[in-house]
Structures are given as structure tokens and as C-alpha cells.
Amino acid sequence: MPLPFGLKLKRTRRYTVSSKSCLVARIQLLNNEFVEFTLSVESTGQESLEAVAQRLELREVTYFSLWYYNKQNQRRWVDLEKPLKKQLDKYALEPTVYFGVVFYVPSVSQLQQEITRYQYYLQLKKDILEGSIPCTLEQAIQLAGLAVQADFGDFDQYESQDFLQKFALFPVGWLQDEKVLEEATQKVALLHQKYRGLTAPDAEMLYMQEVERMDGYGEESYPAKDSQGSDISIGACLEGIFVKHKNGRHPVVFRWHDIANMSHNKSFFALELANKEETIQFQTEDMETAKYIWRLCVARHKFYRLNQCNLQTQTVTVNPIRRRSSSRMSLPKPQPYVMPPPPQLHYNGHYTEPYASSQDNLFVPNQNGYYCHSQTSLDRAQIDLNGRIRNGSVYSAHSTNSLNNPQPYLQPSPMSSNPSITGSDVMRPDYLPSHRHSAVIPPSYRPTPDYETVMKQLNRGLVHAERQSHSLRNLNIGSSYAYSRPAALVYSQPEIREHAQLPSPAAAHCPFSLSYSFHSPSPYPYPAERRPVVGAVSVPELTNAQLQAQDYPSPNIMRTQVYRPPPPYPPPRPANSTPDLSRHLYISSSNPDLITRRVHHSVQTFQEDSLPVAHSLQEVSEPLTAARHAQLHKRNSIEVAGLSHGLEGLRLKERTLSASAAEVAPRAVSVGSQPSVFTERTQREGPEEAEGLRYGHKKSLSDATMLIHSSEEEEDEDFEEESGARAPPARAREPRPGLAQDPPGCPRVLLAGPLHILEPKAHVPDAEKRMMDSSPVRTTAEAQRPWRDGLLMPSMSESDLTTSGRYRARRDSLKKRPVSDLLSGKKNIVEGLPPLGGMKKTRVDAKKIGPLKLAALNGLSLSRVPLPDEGKEVATRATNDERCKILEQRLEQGMVFTEYERILKKRLVDGECSTARLPENAERNRFQDVLPYDDVRVELVPTKENNTGYINASHIKVSVSGIEWDYIATQGPLQNTCQDFWQMVWEQGIAIIAMVTAEEEGGREKSFRYWPRLGSRHNTVTYGRFKITTRFRTDSGCYATTGLKMKHLLTGQERTVWHLQYTDWPEHGCPEDLKGFLSYLEEIQSVRRHTNSTSDPQSPNPPLLVHCSAGVGRTGVVILSEIMIACLEHNEVLDIPRVLDMLRQQRMMLVQTLCQYTFVYRVLIQFLKSSRLI
């Protein structure tokens, strides 16, 4: 059967299109460097030009274009609107393309960007050396002296001036006499000495100003014949179209305002003059040449005519003394000068200005007369254009790997395998690419995917985008009172609802703000996609592992973390634990009366049909060992019970509650006598639950009772007997009066977890110590911290994940009131609550309210104490879908707020920062309240300038399933700490630097630019003993990857350092593009695997260096997200607050705001959803 379109099958019976769909564009820059870009066959010249512009950090692309040698060895400018490959295949002598200036300005002072002036300088120097601009001997010597000063600096840096003889100083083939050449070179050497102290930008500016006054500046001519058949050269210049006769006659210039029309017919090019009724014709070599000259002149005419007023009236003063600094990232502010539209060289259609003849688009057309999109398309979104250039072409490239389709995943167009010539460099504070990620180039470690892979990613992205449109608002909770009332009625503090972007008191000391919206109508709305994510599919193995996440064997996982394995989750159902009430708990306690009224109505109108409960409690009391019971205390800093919706083992039967819990002496209960809440077991009891165990309840405020925060004082744990229950053993009835209070002076250490109890070291059971030592997620420095040895670590079961009860660490917000006042003194707090006392409720009555809500109203929190003999039990891990539901539920019900507030921001003890507080180190700290702990700080080899070896950086080590994750968290380097920063990189063997900020945000410096800018002079910068060179840079949408070479000047050793900068973090809040942030984490993983594969396998893997501004906020987000994703990949227990607490014990205040903490949840949810789609 014949194939369509005339396709022929090979003997392999396969047809591969990948080899025919790509183009490797080899482009020579003005500094004679070659770069290569892998594009699709449909990629236009404009896309290639923009790739070069990104590579050079060039914003003013107006003046530049690409050209090639045709088969007659003549220069021809590329038609930017047409596919580049077709033009090269049809006309080019070789596939090499050249970058250069196509439009010259009357004065180089009009150029806004320094890199533009530098490229202009290279172009003009090239014109002089190639003889395109004729000059005299004196002019050549003068220009050569300026060029040497600009290129090589002051003469006293060199032993002699003999090196000048090795470089081309004069036009090629111009000076044949060796004696004259030597004399001219000596004069250049004298001028070089004369220009001592002149900076490179100054010398370049003087060079360009000298050239722009010379004849031939901005001219481009082509051979032709006039009407008499005489040989002439015709071309365009600044003033108009010139004609130069080769017989010695004076040149003739037809000024732009005198030309009424231009046309071409066959091999003739004609000018129609406005003041004369005549047409002047010129004959060219052939029809193609005539058409090309016509297109070029039309473009020049339109460009200069529209620029005439602007260029003459513009009063832009460029300071020639402004130094080109590799560390300066701020760009000149936009001037009122408006660029004209790109000139049009058309093949078809009509020129709408004064011309009527047909023409073709060589440059990007623009009907509005403004040259805006050629600049803004590279650095900002075209909001008014809806992501399209004004001629209708889509912003993204038509390349194979950046598919020009609406999809959430877009792979950047890969480049050749040479890592030294990759990339684009567009990282600036005001440069946030939004739509155009067309010709970006990935680094060498990410190879080009084949055609099938690209198509799979395309299809996957479309499916994912479709699924992403669904929201969580379909939960059947609309009938509850809180959801049917306006937000101002439901939430107790409208100022939080109305001003969610303002900084919270908890974050008032830092430049971050609280941006989590408590009043969002959709608890977890999917963010609007602002741009396609480039590089999001670069590491498929990172997310593919999620497919088998639940199949991983777990005999060695959490052996000592004992808990009851939760049953599988049922199908989706309406909310199950009064989210309308739980939302109130996480706003504030400063206005309890408002909360009381809202909760009162919510409880009063709560009906069974509004929230049908499909889940019941598996366990509501804690089995206590004798040693555990001996040290049990009750904390009444109000733990909020967020009850798991994944436990179905028990059904609530009965509840009793003492009228005054604080006044009742502690009494023990047996296994069969459970106070407050009765449970009917539907699962087989474990053998470890023997009669000698005791059950105790943690008194914690429920949704309704978290109206007033009590004090930090601790009172006895109350044990109550249910009437009619079996009598407990005598030994269990004995009261333990010694347990009423904490020992005086005992510090309270609150850890993230459902149970926080501080005990003397001698009373910690061995099993609990083993649990601390063998936790799957633990810090390697944990055992070195004495204060942690006295803590009972919380259980890390999946049920704990859904338990919102964790103590608040914000003690300044707690009111010191005994719990007896809460339970007995305020009888009218919530009228809808059952009366306190020994009243019993039947099963039917309890069922009306529901077990989850009823247990919450009684202050119960799900938590298990690990038993010594339960260490062998291994629980079944939840699937990705279940984990995703759990995380979404926590966000939806607002549990994250109190969860975050209970995590200590810094150590309570053993947190000395003596070295950081030394007077000589004060200037090395960006913020005086963010300091590294002495025991985990990065210690440098002391130097004369830094005799303490101090840098504001901390080691962070976390072990996940036996794999150690090693980080260094540090602040953004200051100008005076760049040398220390690179010394740390060298001594610690850093291979990857993850930067999560821009150099400047909102006019404030976030990090000094410590690496050289690509395109700057020699791409190098030196800090002390280290020389840093930028080899390449590639922009991938929301992040940029830069390859750096680091050389130790004393030893000559060299290393490669990867710099990964996330560029999409807003000044306030957190990124909305979750997949973009995930693609950044995947890029870190890709580079980490690449560096580890090339390093010595016997040496330990180097730590990942992460920094933002202070080195705690965004830095903590990156580290916490990576570790939690690793837990998901290894099917470990997901306990985000406990891991964050571990991190904060090694560097204070990591994940600085609630907004950032919530962002980590959203990232994990997005990760689970993405892994589910693969």
C-alpha cells in the first residue's frame, strides 16, 4: 500500500522525521565567536535573531540582523519573516550566518543599552579593518590607539608594546610597506600610553564618535549601471540613496524626503522623485539583485524617515564615563524615545506609505508605526497583543522542541552538544520573559528529545491542561452555614480578607509578606498559567518514579515509627470535618468574640445532610506505657484537632466530659474503660494492646473551642471513668500528684507533631530514643544536639499528617488563662455545644453530629505514642492520589496556618551565634537577625582579610531513606563578601549554585552580582585568588542556567560550576507558576546527576549551594520542597512541619513566611498531580 505524500519506507519499515525536522544554525558574532542553535526547519530568521539577542543580553534588537554569503559570495541580509533554513538552502554559499548592524544611527549617543554600544563598536571596528569605511593613515592610527586601549586596557599592564604587532590594527591589505607599518605601530603604542586611565567604555565611545564623522559610515552599496551604461555603486546611507560613479564623478545623493516612490521591474531598480516628474532607473546584475536592493532601500527609507524626528529631537545624554561592570545588572531607564517600527522588505502586498509597487517582508512588519515589539518581546509580556506579534505570528518558536501549541510543558529548543557555546542570557531585574521562549537552548546534559518524545509531551500537556481546569469547589459543602454566607460574615477579621497581601506581624521584620488568602472562594484554585514552562520535561525520570511510588518495598522504612496502618481512602466525597468551622481557627485569636459568633451560628445550623460523614475514627485515645504515663503532662496552649478523613476503624459511641476538667485529680483508666469517647472496634486488636496499657486524652481545643488561647501553663492530664465501665486495676487508680506541673525552669520545646512532651533525659524510653535515631527523615547532626535527646519525637504516620493539632510557638499571642476558665467559666461560648458534665448521648444522637466533628468538639487529636514492641510493624504507605487529597484538604481547611505557627523559627537552646556576632563580622551579614549557628556554620580557611574564616552560611544535612541530602544555605553575597563566597565554593567543592532571587527587586539590592555577565569584556571577573569566567548561559523561561569556569590563580586548577538562577519569583508573595518552579527543581536534579556522574565516584557528592537574599526564605522553600519530593519518591512519610523543624535547627527562620510554607504544599500537590499524569 503506497504511503501518502510520496513517502517511501526503508528496509527497516520505519520512517524517521527527526533528522529532517531540525536545523543547526551556526552564527558568527561580531567578536568572531561562533554559536550554534538547534531550531526547527520552520524557524524564522526573527527567531534566530532573538536567540542571539538573548545570548548577548541585547534588548535593542532594532539595529541588528543576520546576513549570509550568497552563492556569488555577496552579502545578503536574511529575510526575518521567512524560514531560515529555506533561505540558506536556496541562496547561501555555506550554512554559516553572521550577526551584524543593519541600521546605523546618526549618533551613537542615541543607543540606550551598554551592550548595544559594545556591539556597535565591534561592528564599526570590523568595518574599518575590512575597509568598508575608508580612512586615512592618521585616522587609522588614531582609531587603532583607541581600539587598543578599549581592548587591552592600560599599557603599563604589559612589559612591552611588542604584542601590538600580533594584532590587526589597520585595514587588511592596506599597508604593504613593512617600514610604514612599523612606524604606524609605534605611533599606536604612543597613543596607547597617552590614553592611560581611559576606561573601555570611554575608549569605545570615542572610537565610535570618530567613525561616525567619517565618509562611508552607515553605507551599504551594490554594483549597478546607470542609464548611460556606466558602472556605478548604488546603496543606502543615513541621508538617502547614494550613487557613486567609478569614473571619478562626484557622488549623487537622493535624499529620503525627495523620494516619492521606489520600484523594481525585472533587473531594473527605479526611483520616482517628488519634486521632479521623472523616474531614474538603474540596471542591476539580475532580477533577484534588483528586488533585494529595492527591499533594502525601502526598509532603510522607512526606518530613517520615521526616526528622523525622534533622532534629531531626542535629548538623550549618555555618560561616556559610565563603567562597564560585570557586577552591574541595573539597566538604563526607558527614555521617552519611541523606536520606530521595523522596516519592511516585502515580497508580496503593497507598501502602504508612498509606494504602490509590490514588496515583500524582510523584517517584522508593523502597521502602527512604533517599534515596540522588537524590544519588548524579549523582556516583557505584550499584554495588549495577547501574546502575539502585531503581524499575527505567535510569540513562541516553531521549533521541534518548543512546540508552537498551547500546552503547559514546552521544551526549549536544544543546541549542539558543545556546552561552551550554548544559551541565552536575559537575567535582569526588569527582564522576565513571558511569551517568547522560542530559540532558547538547553545545556549539554539535556539532549534533544526525538520526535516521538516531543509529540508525547505535547499530548500529555494538552491532557494535563484539560484536567487542570477542574476545581475543588465541587465538594458538597455549600449547605453549611459558613459557605452560604458572605466572606465578611464568616471570617472574624475582614482586614486579613481585604488586605491579604500586607505583611503579617509574624513577618514584619523581613521583606516578605503574607499573601495566602483565607477568603478564597476556591480553597485551592489552580493558578492561571502566565507562560509556557520551558524545560519542564527535561527530567522525566524524576516524575516517572511516582508511578511506582506505592510499590516500593518498605521493610526498612519507619521501623520504629509505630502507628496503626490507615485503611484505603474511599472515593471522593463531600467534606467530612466541618471545614466551615475549621477555617476560623487559623486567622487570629485577637478577636475571639467575632469568632465566637461565627462559630456559634455555624454549629447551630450544622445539619447531618450538609456534611455526610463517610469516615470514622480509628483511634481516639493513646495507649500509654508505664514509663510514658509517669511523665505525661497536659499542655493547654490549645491544640486544634484536625481529624483525619482516612481512618475508618472506629465508630463513635458515647462521650462524657467533666464539668471542670482542671479540678479533677488524675485518675487512670483501663483498656476497657475509655473516658470521654467510647470506641467500637471494627478491626482486630493488635496483640500489643494489653490490659496493662492506659489510655489518655490530649486536651486540645476543637473547632468551636479555639476561641480563646489559654496560657502556656501546664496542668494535670485528666483521666475520667465512664460510669458502668469495668473497674481498672488498683495500681492504675493511684493518682500521680507529682505530674501536675513541669519542673521549674524546664524549657518548653515545641516540635511539629501531634504530641510534644518535654521530659528529663533519664525518663525517655529506649524505644523512643531508637525512634529518634532511626527516623527515615532526620538530620545527621541530630545526635549531637543535647536538647533533642530529652524530647519525645512525634509519630510520623499518615494519620498524623492530617492531624492539625500542633502547638503554637507564637507565645506572645497567647493569653494566660487556665483551662478551667475555658471549660467551666464560659458556659455561653458556643450555645450549640452539648452541655458539659456526665451527660450521655446515644449512638443516634452522636451520629447526627458525626464522629469527626464530635471528637473535634471534645478536643481530641489523633496521635499515637510508639510502643517498644510495635517497632516491627510496617504500615502501608498511601498512594499518590491519597497523599494529594490529604495535602489539598489541609490547604482547603486552613490547617496549614496553625501548623506553620507552631514550628519554632529558631533554636531555644544551644543556638549560639558567637562568631557571627563578632564586631569584625557585622559587615559580612546582610541582616543582623539572620545568623548561622556556630556548630553548623561553614568555616573558611582564615585569611588576612577574614581571620575568623566567617561567612553567613550554614550546613544543612537531611537523610531520607538512608540517602543524605547535603546543602549549604547562605545569604546573597555582598560586595565585600564575594571573595569569601567564591572561597567557600572552592573549599566546599560546590558544583551547583542555586540562586532564587534577582540582583535587584523593587530598587533594593538582593544579591551583588558575583559572576561575570556574558557578553561583557572577556566574560571574566577576579575575586582574590579566584578567576571566574562565564562560558555560556541558557534561558529556560522561569530560570536561567549558566556555565562558569572557576580557576585558582595560585595553583592553576580549574573547575566547572553551574549557576541556576530562578527568575520568576515575584517581589511580593510566591510564584503562581507551580510547574515552572517544579521545572527549576528538575533542572537542579538534572545538573546534580550530571555533575555527580562526571565526578570521582569514591568522593562524596558536593553539597548544593542555595541562596536568595537573606538565605532563609526562598532558600528554605527550595530545600524543603526538594526533601519532601524525595520523601514522595521514596514513599516515605510526609511530615512537612517536622522536616521544616529539622531544617530550622540547622539554620534559623527557613521558609520565612506562611505564604512560602503554603507554596511548598502547592508545589507538592502539583508534583503529585503531574506524576499521576505520566
Curated annotation (Swiss-Prot):
Keyword Cytoplasm included in the entry's annotation: yes
Family under the similarity heading: Belongs to the protein-tyrosine phosphatase family. Non-receptor class subfamily.
EC identifiers of the protein: 3.1.3.48
Basic and acidic residues: compositionally biased ranges: 681-692
Name assigned to this protein: Tyrosine-protein phosphatase non-receptor type 21
Compositionally biased residues, Polar residues: 396-423, 796-805
Biased composition (Acidic residues): 712-722
This protein's encoding gene: PTPN21
Subcellular location: Cytoplasm, Cytoskeleton
Active-site residues, as the UniProt record annotates them: C1108 (phosphocysteine intermediate)
GO cellular component annotations of the record: cytoplasm; cytoskeleton
Enzyme class name: hydrolase
Organism this protein belongs to: Homo sapiens (Human)
Main location: cytoplasm
PROSITE patterns to which the protein is assigned, alphabetical: FERM_1, FERM_2, FERM_3, TYR_PHOSPHATASE_1, TYR_PHOSPHATASE_2, TYR_PHOSPHATASE_PTP
Biological process annotations from GO: protein dephosphorylation
